[in-house]
C-alpha cells in the first residue's frame, strides 16, 4: 500500500481525478483523469522482475482495457519491460523527473 499511496498523492499533486477500476474479476489500481478528460491507467507493484506470475497479474488487467489511453505498470525495478503498448516505468524516476501520465 505504501507505493500505491505515493502514486495516489503524486497524481493528486498534478490535479488528476482518481478512481479504482474493475474489469470483470480484474482490478486496475488507478484510473486517472485530467482536466481535459484524458485518462491513464496505472498498476503499481514493488517488483515484477522476480516472478512471471506477478508480472502477468500486473499486465493482465491493463491488457484487457480496449481503449487507447496510456497504461502504466509502475515498479521499483530498473530493468524495464514494456508489453503490448503498456509502459513499464520506474516509480522513483517518474516522480523525480516530474513526469505526467
Predicted feature descriptions by range:
Residues 1-101:
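A cross-kingdom feature that marks ATP-driven nucleic-acid transaction machinery
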Amino acid at each position: 500500500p505504501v507505493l500505491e499511496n505515493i502514486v495516489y498523492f503524486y497524481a493528486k499533486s498534478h490535479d488528476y481525478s482518481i478512481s479504482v477500476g474493475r474489469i470483470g474479476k480484474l482490478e486496475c489500481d488507478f484510473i486517472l483523469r485530467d482536466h481535459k478528460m484524458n485518462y491513464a491507467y496505472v498498476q503499481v507493484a514493488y517488483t515484477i522482475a522476480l516472478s512471471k506470475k506477478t508480472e502477468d497479474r500486473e499486465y493482465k488487467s491493463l491488457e484487457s482495457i480496449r481503449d487507447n489511453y496510456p497504461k502504466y505498470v509502475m515498479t521499483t525495478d530498473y530493468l524495464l519491460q514494456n508489453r503490448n503498448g503498456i509502459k513499464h516505468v520506474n516509480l522513483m524516476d517518474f516522480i523525480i523527473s516530474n513526469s505526467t501520465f
